[in-house]
């Protein structure tokens, strides 16, 4: 569900509520979601319909019940002001946030194989390559309304449902050495530099 909400700049909570699901629900293959199209931005670059591919990715969660329970307990207790934010990778920012130019995040230039770490503690809600233009992507939920995304990875080292700390390596960068990084608040992209120390 997170990958679908991410693709359409839609709040996971609102998408889940509109469909009578909890925001951590796992979708089943072929399950149909009700999208209020008047509130959903259409993407010109994606002609794929929602359904089979995203549902298969969402249904393939390898996290065990204990780690999911631990993650859910942590999410219920976390306060955003208590999160300690850090940069996700050592490198230079080469593309800045600019929503007018459809730049929803920032790009760090580092080196191939560099370690990527979460900007703050959170729960992995998506780990895969089912979203166009992001390559191998990790999305982490930090609170009820804050998500961060890490794209263009060569190798993912975490699984959906896993609780991760800010110092933990979650992925390795691909051949370009670039990390696409985004933060969303209530489903909408915000300038990541407002959060990073």
Q: Where are these predicted regions, by residue range?
A:
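Extracytoplasmic low-complexity/disordered linkers and repeat tracts associated with LysM-containing
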Residues: 1-169, 175-180, 185-189, 193-195
């Amino acid at each position: 569900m997170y990958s679908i909400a991410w693709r359409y700049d839609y709040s996971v909570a609102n998408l889940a509520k509109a469909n009578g699901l909890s925001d951590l629900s796992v979708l089943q293959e072929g399950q149909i979601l009700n999208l209020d199209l008047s509130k959903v931005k259409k993407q010109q670059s994606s002609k794929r319909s929602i359904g089979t591919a995203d549902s298969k990715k969402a249904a393939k969660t390898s996290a065990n019940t204990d780690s999911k329970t631990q993650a859910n307990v942590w999410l219920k207790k976390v306060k955003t002001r208590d999160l300690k934010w850090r940069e996700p990778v050592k490198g230079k920012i080469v593309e800045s946030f600019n929503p007018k130019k459809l730049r929803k995040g920032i790009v760090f230039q580092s080196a191939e194989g560099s370690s990527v770490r979460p900007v703050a503690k959170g729960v992995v809600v998506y780990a895969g390559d089912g979203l166009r233009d992001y390559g191998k992507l990790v999305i982490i939920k930090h609170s009820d309304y804050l998500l961060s995304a890490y794209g263009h990875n060569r190798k993912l080292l975490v699984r959906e449902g896993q609780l991760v700390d800010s110092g933990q390596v979650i992925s390795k960068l691909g051949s370009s050495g670039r990390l696409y990084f985004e933060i969303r608040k209530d489903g909408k992209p915000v300038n990541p530099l407002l959060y990073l120390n």
